[in-house]
């Protein structure tokens, strides 16, 4: 698809509610309490999550580095801990020193080409690169704990379902 359409589709989220049912089983549609769509329930959920993260000394404050780089941690939907179809852990081994799987999604954005979701159990890395005016390569990688064993600690297909569906939906929208 046209690279400008691919990038625009991936940076605006107004299409998500109508286009990404799998993704919105766990991911909140926005990542800012000042978003005009943010209702009081969302703001309360963010505040409760921030209090829990403070207790565990988990950083979450928005940080911007120029216009293209941003880091923010946002909660997932209540009752979910990972971007899987059922919202449960996709990998039994948690990342790094993490002991609590309910850490939301730490988003690391290097716009316009890369955005990442870091959860307690795995990390999703996206890159988008234009090849020509009408062709774009979108790459998605899933990272798990270095000691996690496929088939024992995680199921690749189960962990990929949400973003495989979302990427395919976005491809159809942009083409």
Residue ranges and their predicted role:
Residues 1-175:
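C-terminal catalytic domain of Rieske-type non-heme iron oxygenases
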């Amino acid at each position: 698809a046209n690279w400008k359409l691919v990038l625009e589709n991936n940076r605006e989220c107004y299409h998500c509610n109508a286009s990404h049912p799998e993704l919105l089983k766990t991911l909140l549609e926005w990542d800012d309490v000042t978003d005009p769509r943010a209702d009081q329930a969302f703001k309360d959920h963010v505040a409760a999550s921030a209090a829990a993260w403070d207790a565990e000394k988990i950083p979450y404050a928005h940080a911007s580095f120029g216009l293209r780089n941003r880091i923010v941690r946002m909660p997932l939907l209540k009752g979910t801990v990972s971007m899987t179809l059922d919202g449960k852990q996709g990998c039994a081994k948690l990342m790094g020193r993490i002991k609590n799987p309910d850490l939301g999604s730490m988003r690391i954005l290097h716009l316009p080409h890369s955005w990442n979701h870091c959860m307690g159990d795995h990390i999703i890395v996206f890159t988008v690169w234009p090849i020509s005016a009408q062709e774009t390569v979108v790459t998605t990688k899933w990272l798990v704990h270095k000691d996690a064993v496929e088939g024992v600690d995680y199921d690749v297909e189960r962990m990929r379902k949400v973003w495989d569906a979302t990427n395919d939906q976005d491809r159809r929208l942009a083409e």
